[in-house]
Regions:
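A surface-exposed partner-binding patch
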Residues: 1-110, 162-168, 176-205
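Short, surface-exposed beta-strand/loop micro-motifs that present aromatic residues
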Residues: 112-120
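Compact, glycine/acidic-enriched structural inserts
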Residues: 132-159
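A broad, low-specificity signal marking well-ordered, structured residues that form hydrophobic/aromatic
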Residues: 102-103, 114-115, 128
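Intrinsically disordered, low-complexity regulatory segments enriched in Ser/Thr/Pro
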Residues: 123-134
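Helix-boundary capping/turn motifs
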Residues: 18-19, 121-124
Length: 205
């Protein structure tokens, strides 16, 4: 795969050390969703995969996969949640879009849903739509793709945080693939840090 400049920039501040190629069947994904996906998202799945950023945000799988301990979060469920939130907020009177144009790709620990607004026929031009839980606006469009949005969020480049949590504290940024996190849990370690955790694995089958 050709290296994606946005993902390369993101990797400079958030190493892919604990990421993994998700090995996505993109024709199958496109058949299910009825659309292609942005090049930066495709590249992210190939370099990082789905997983957690600092335990504060999760990047979702485009299609379901069985987990080692629990099923990892997927786009379909959170897309439904975002569309339901749109309806609950007043539908078109609150945010005048077709709800079918809302597709989720991530969530935060503050219960925000990170989405694309897919009204442009070119997926690489889809802006990020934040469906916020405790943000100034319930729906806010940001004129960046997924990778640039994450870069700006992780670099603290927003004057006002676009999400409901203090995402960046100036510390180390870490991405952990969902499969690695679940292995750590099974081994009695903290899924995010890998440090011993007496509670990790407590509810393992």
């Amino acid at each position: 795969m050709t290296e994606n400049a946005r993902i390369k920039a993101l990797e400079q501040i958030m190493p892919a050390t604990h990421g993994a190629d998700e090995d996505i069947d993109w024709p199958a994904v496109e058949a299910v969703w009825g659309t292609r996906f942005p090049a930066d998202f495709v590249a992210f799945m190939g370099r990082f995969g789905a997983g957690s950023i600092n335990g504060e945000a999760s990047i979702l799988l485009p299609l379901p996969k069985p987990g080692l301990q629990w099923d990892p979060a997927g786009m379909a469920e959170e897309t439904d949640n975002a569309r339901q939130a749109w309806e609950a907020e007043g539908g078109r009177s609150a945010f005048d879009v077709d709800p079918e144009s809302i597709i989720a790709w991530g969530v935060t620990g503050g219960s925000d849903i990170l989405c694309w607004l897919t009204t442009d026929p070119d997926p690489d031009r889809w802006p990020v739509l934040v469906c916020g839980r405790h943000t100034a606006d319930a729906f806010a469009v940001h004129p960046y793709g997924m990778a640039e949005f994450l870069y700006r969020l992780c670099s603290d480049e927003f004057d006002v945080s676009p999400v409901s949590i203090t995402f960046w504290d100036g510390g180390h940024l870490s991405f952990v693939h969902w499969r690695k996190a679940q292995r750590r849990w099974q081994e009695g370690r903290n899924p995010e840090t890998g440090e011993p955790d007496p509670y990790a694995g407590e509810f393992a089958d």
